[in-house]
């Protein structure tokens, strides 16, 4: 210790800190006892730990002394301790041990560090004390200097201990000198309330402040037994038992079980199993811990998702002790889900370090350990954190880069980091300042050098980072990292210099050499454009073959990368100038389409625990509404009389149904309506919640949330070169070298189209051409000229189909190429939402999603929309339970929701408009689901069929398929096609009667837009045997279709060689039929749904019944261009359609809509109820959505 005289000299002339000040302080707090016979404070009663050899030495007032402190109060340390160190305006000094200095140290200003012994008394342990008052009460501090200090440790000097203090353990010292670094209290972490001291200290046990625990805490035999009065934590002890104790408490609070089982005979080891509340067993602790976190954090967002860092075991124990104290104080609230989630998040970093990554040994060595909060942090955020640490140049870390060359790109922040990056063993940041305005970054090149050339280090200009929260690293540093000083110099391959335009961002990208380049974003875009121009100039054949460019990870190598595989990139053209260019093709790619894969039963549980649905709950609309939190359990539901709005029945909503108050039975929602005397076969408009809110409004509210989530969940991924074409074949769904359509994004394999050579000139796919003349049908043409059939989706020229320029005004815009498509369309639309009872209490119904059009509709249509869309959301859960998610790599579209919600797309392969969903239910519980799409009367496809896991192997799928086949046969659909997995081909063929297709039938289907999956097998089943020739063969074997050149017709359609009108045989998708049959096509024009009957097609037209309609001669229908014959054919068609309207009305008498309009002739197509208008509006919505896309 320093002599008292020297201490007085250090005090200066100021009174504060002088000997007199210290004497007054001692008299106030310790009385005027001259001999200091008592060691208890007069104010607080705290014991003075000062030893006899240091009582009258004025050294404890120095702010640079080692401090251990605590608050004195009658209830103990924990009751009065403050957890916020910011309440005290104190400062501390951090002492970092140096290996080449003595304990007789001085700080940067040359002042001696008070409180440290010289080397001759370094082996003594000198306790000092200090009692201070503050707004929190009176605090006492005990200053301890042990006989040794460990080299490389950090010691905090001075200040009042707060709730975030670091524990001090001053171990052996080699007589080295300290280096003191002043820092404010708010920027340092402090010792915990319980201070550990060495065993050699005489008053170590008294100086230790106990870590108080609740008296009610129970400790199981498998956990660490803790003392109720004092817990002495030694950083060198194993932290696993203590941490495991609290982990077990969190698991037990979450209703998990921990079982120990002995291994087989002869082994003394015991296995531990962690069992979830659902009965799932985990052998590994890490998997159980992550599963617990996934359940607790499923519906919650934690604010703290950063990282935690510790340097040494002392720092780790300091943070852990505070966390455990907080958990112990709030242990009684662990029965709350929010509290369990909070404490799981608090313990997660410690559990990862101790049990999962097992880095305790690294902490004991004094190394720095960093761990992310939560187990599954976002990958991009993780990359941002790594790159920010690299750029900021932390003093304790070294900026490392990959062996590859990098481009720095994409930094946008509200703070700027001025850093001089010097190529040495360490790159540090010199200055960090915040700024709101955006700055520019001048690109400079930094090349790595050897250590011998470190003095010549190339220094980059100021590196200004903007918006640290955005991504600053777009490529993973996945190669072996090394210091910049170890990277050998390398030169650029093609570009000697980089543009110095302003940068908006940085980008790290890889190259085989070890350079870092700072490049401007503007120059990068300009260089890309130049590369494209150069490539187009170099290729002798411009635009012949469209290939997706694969950019390398260095823009300076862009040119060489784009032109790799040059043999496949472009097709050499012949030198003949008269030869027409070939059709465009795409370079071979391996992306392809999505494969149909079933979900294994072991992954089903994990899939549904991550979402809102529970696999154990029933698949009903009520259960879905409860899961979406639109309605709550035990909420009152009422059935009211539509006449006087009086309550007829009342019940309580549960997950299993409705508890009827009159009979106290749990029934389904349909039985509840039937119990009240209402028809359960149609949407109920008089069903209300207890709050007065209509039940249909609750369904629409839940559907709105589902619609937004699904629509916003997918994104359109554009190709790197803005290639608009698809990456998958429209026939087989696989990738490869593809032929591009010149009108739409569709692409095809040449072999799938059965083409021997590429067609010359522009080439158009079947979705863009007329099905009669095979010429392009423009989407921008007026509806009166060209149109698309609303049922089979085939396109036609108006002149090709009817041969005349006269057309009727159509409202709404629903077109048909023939009466067969119209009958199929009306038959399916009239069955939407209708419940068809079956045996054993089962029922089936057809559903179709009603799009969001923003229009005002009738209450009946809104109720039907709410019912159908809600059931489709439930059906989607069964599909997702049965199949793995199929996200298209080109567009990002999740195909299964798009199929069930019949959403359209600009990509023909992903255009699922026209799909219907057929479901089988029992007591409102959905059992089986199938998606179907009917392409006229030619063929219907059923790509997806699924059954709820609870009802599998009970024949439910067979009941569903039988209902679909019966419905299609009533609509006279010829064939049903399924895409079968290889493992289920035998089941479909032997159990359901399907057969493989021959080559001719597969070729006939190539023009039809089927939903196909790579690796599946197409199977067919004949449903309706017609007397007409095979429409499948007739459709695709016409003369024009077999000519792939798309040459112009020699003669104008409808005219002979002399240019006069001629008789033209109609060849629509369903018109190769004998005359006089029920399947006869409409003569002269496509029949629209809802045709305006107030405007006749001619003055002499008078719709009347044709009594001899069935006595027509059996010959092929020929349309005459003459005016009189046209009017006569029109009258016959109107008369026949009137009778068919009555037959259709009688067949679907269960629909209230058709009952209202029976007997109205052709008006049955126009004056229909809300169900029919719904289908029309839906078609309009689909068209508008496609136009918007």
UniProtKB/Swiss-Prot annotation:
It comes from the Eukaryota. Changing residue 942 to A: Decreased acetyltransferase activity. This is Increased DNA methylation 1. Interacts (via N-terminus) with IDM2. Interacts with IMD3. Part of a complex made of MBD7, IDM1, IDM2 and IDM3. It is found in: Nucleus. Keywords: Acyltransferase, Metal-binding, Nucleus, Repeat, Transcription, Transcription regulation, Transferase, Zinc, Zinc-finger. Signal peptide: none annotated. The keyword Magnesium does not apply. Disruption phenotype: DNA hypermethylation.
């Amino acid at each position: 210790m320093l002599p008292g005289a020297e201490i007085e000299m250090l005090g200066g002339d100021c009174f504060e800190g002088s000997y007199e000040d210290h004497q007054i302080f001692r008299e106030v707090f310790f009385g005027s006892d001259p001999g200091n016979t008592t060691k208890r404070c007069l104010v607080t009663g705290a014991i003075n730990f000062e030893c006899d050899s240091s009582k009258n030495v004025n050294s404890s007032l120095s702010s640079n002394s080692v401090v251990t402190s605590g608050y004195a109060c009658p209830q103990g340390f924990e009751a009065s301790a403050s957890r916020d160190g910011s309440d005290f305006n104190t400062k501390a000094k951090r002492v970092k041990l140096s290996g080449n200095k003595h304990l007789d140290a001085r700080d940067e200003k040359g002042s001696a560090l008070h409180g440290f012994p010289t080397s001759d008394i370094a082996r003594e342990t000198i306790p000092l004390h200090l009692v201070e008052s503050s707004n929190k009460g009176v605090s006492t501090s005990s200053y301890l200097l042990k006989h040794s200090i460990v080299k490389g440790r950090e010691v905090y000097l001075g200040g009042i201990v707060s709730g975030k203090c670091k524990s001090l353990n001053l171990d052996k010292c080699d007589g080295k000198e300290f280096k003191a670094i002043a820092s404010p209290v708010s920027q340092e972490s402090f010792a915990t309330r319980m201070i550990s001291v060495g065993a050699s200290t005489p008053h170590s046990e008294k100086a230790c402040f106990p870590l108080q625990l609740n008296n009610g805490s129970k400790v199981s035999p498998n956990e660490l037994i803790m003392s109720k009065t004092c817990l002495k934590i030694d950083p060198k002890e194993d932290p696993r038992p203590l941490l495991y104790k609290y982990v077990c408490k969190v698991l037990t609070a979450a209703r998990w079980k921990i079982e120990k089982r002995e291994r087989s005979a002869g082994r003394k080891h015991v296995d531990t199993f962690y069992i979830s509340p659902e009965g799932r067993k985990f052998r590994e602790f890490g998997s159980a811990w992550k599963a617990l976190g996934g359940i607790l954090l499923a519906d919650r967002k934690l604010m703290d998702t950063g990282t935690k860092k510790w340097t040494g075991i002392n720092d780790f124990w300091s943070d852990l002790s505070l966390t455990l104290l907080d958990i112990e104080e709030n242990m009684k609230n662990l029965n709350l889900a929010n509290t369990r989630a909070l404490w799981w998040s608090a313990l997660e970093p410690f559990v990862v370090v101790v049990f999962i990554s097992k880095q305790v040994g690294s902490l004991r060595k004094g190394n720095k350990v960093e761990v992310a909060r939560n187990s599954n942090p976002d990958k991009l955020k993780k990359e941002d954190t790594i790159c920010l640490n690299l750029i900021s140049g932390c003093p304790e870390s070294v900026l490392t880069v990959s062996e590859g060359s990098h481009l720095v790109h994409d930094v946008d922040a509200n703070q700027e980091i001025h850093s001089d990056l010097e190529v040495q063993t360490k790159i540090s940041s010199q200055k960090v300042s915040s700024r709101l305005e955006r700055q520019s970054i001048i690109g400079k090149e930094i090349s790595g050098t050897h250590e011998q050339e470190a003095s010549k280090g190339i220094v980059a200009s100021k590196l200004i980072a903007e918006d640290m929260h955005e991504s600053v690293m777009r490529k993973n540093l996945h190669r072996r990292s090394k210091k910049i000083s170890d990277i050998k110099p390398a030169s650029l391959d093609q570009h000697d210099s980089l543009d110095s335009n302003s940068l908006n961002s940085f980008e790290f990208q890889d190259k085989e050499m070890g350079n870092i380049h700072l490049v401007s974003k503007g120059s990068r875009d300009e260089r890309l454009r130049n590369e494209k121009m150069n490539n187009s100039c170099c290729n002798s054949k411009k635009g012949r073959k469209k290939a997706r460019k694969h950019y390398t990870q260095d823009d300076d190598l862009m040119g060489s990368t784009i032109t790799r595989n040059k043999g496949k990139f472009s097709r050499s053209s012949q030198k003949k100038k008269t030869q027409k260019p070939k059709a465009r093709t795409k370079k071979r790619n391996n992306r392809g389409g999505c494969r149909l894969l079933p979900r294994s039963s072991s992954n089903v549980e994990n899939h549904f625990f991550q979402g809102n649905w529970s696999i154990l709950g029933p698949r009903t609309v009520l259960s879905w509404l409860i899961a979406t939190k639109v309605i709550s359990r035990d909420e009152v539901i009422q059935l009211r009389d539509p006449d006087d709005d009086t309550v007829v029945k009342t019940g309580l909503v549960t997950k299993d149904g409705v508890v009827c108050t009159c009979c106290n039975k749990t029934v389904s929602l349909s039985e509840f309506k039937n119990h009240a005397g209402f028809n359960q076969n149609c949407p109920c408009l008089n069903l209300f919640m207890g709050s007065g809110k209509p039940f249909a409004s609750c369904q629409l509210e839940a559907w709105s949330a589902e619609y937004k989530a699904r629509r916003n969940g997918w994104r359109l991924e554009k190709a790197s070169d803005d290639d608009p074409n698809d990456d998958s074949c429209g026939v087989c769904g696989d990738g490869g070298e593809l032929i591009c359509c010149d009108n739409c994004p569709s692409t095809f394999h040449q072999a799938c189209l059965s083409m021997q050579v590429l067609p010359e000139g522009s080439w158009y796919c079947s979705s863009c051409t007329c099905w009669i003349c095979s010429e392009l049908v423009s989407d921008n043409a007026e509806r009166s000229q060209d149109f698309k059939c609303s049922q089979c989706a085939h396109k036609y020229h108006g002149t090709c189909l009817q041969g005349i320029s006269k057309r009727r005004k159509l409202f709404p815009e629903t077109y048909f190429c023939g009466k067969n498509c119209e009958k199929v369309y009306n038959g399916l639309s009239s069955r939407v939402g209708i419940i068809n009872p079956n045996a054993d209490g089962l029922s089936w119904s057809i559903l179709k999603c009603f799009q969001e059009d923003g229009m005002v509709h009738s209450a009946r249509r809104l109720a039907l929309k709410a019912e159908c869309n809600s059931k489709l959301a439930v059906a989607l859960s069964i599909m997702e339970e049965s199949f793995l998610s199929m996200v298209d790599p080109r567009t990002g579209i999740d195909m299964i929701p798009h199929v069930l919600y019949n959403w359209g797309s600009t990509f023909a392969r992903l255009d699922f408009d026209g799909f219907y969903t057929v479901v089988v239910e029992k007591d409102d519980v959905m059992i089986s689901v199938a998606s179907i799409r009917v392409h006229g009367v030619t063929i219907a496809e059923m790509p997806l069929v699924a059954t709820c896991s609870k009802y599998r192997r009970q024949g439910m799928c067979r009941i569903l398929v039988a209902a679909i086949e019966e419905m299609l046969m009533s609509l006279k659909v010829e064939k049903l096609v399924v895409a079968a997995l290889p493992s289920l081909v035998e089941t479909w063929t032997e159990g359901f009667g399907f057969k493989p297709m021959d080559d001719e039938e597969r070729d006939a289907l190539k023009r039809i837009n089927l939903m196909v999956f790579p690796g599946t097998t197409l199977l067919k089943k004949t449903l309706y045997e017609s007397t007409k020739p095979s429409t499948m063969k007739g459709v695709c074997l016409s003369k024009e279709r077999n000519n792939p050149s798309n040459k112009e017709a020699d003669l104008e359609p409808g005219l002979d060689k002399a240019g006069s009108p001629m008789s033209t045989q109609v060849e629509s998708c369903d018109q190769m039929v004998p005359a006089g049959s029920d399947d006869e096509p409409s003569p002269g024009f496509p029949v629209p749904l809802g045709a305006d009957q107030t405007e006749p097609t001619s003055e002499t037209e008078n719709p009347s019944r044709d009594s001899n309609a069935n006595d027509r001669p059996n010959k092929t229908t020929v349309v005459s261009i003459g005016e009189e014959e046209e009017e006569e054919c029109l009258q016959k068609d109107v008369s026949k359609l009137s009778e068919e309207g009555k037959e259709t009305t009688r067949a679907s008498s269960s629909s209230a809509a058709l009952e209202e309009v029976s007997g109205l002739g052709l008006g049955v197509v126009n004056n229909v109820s809300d169900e029919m208008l719904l289908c029309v509006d839906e078609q309009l919505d689909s068209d508008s959505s496609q136009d918007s896309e």
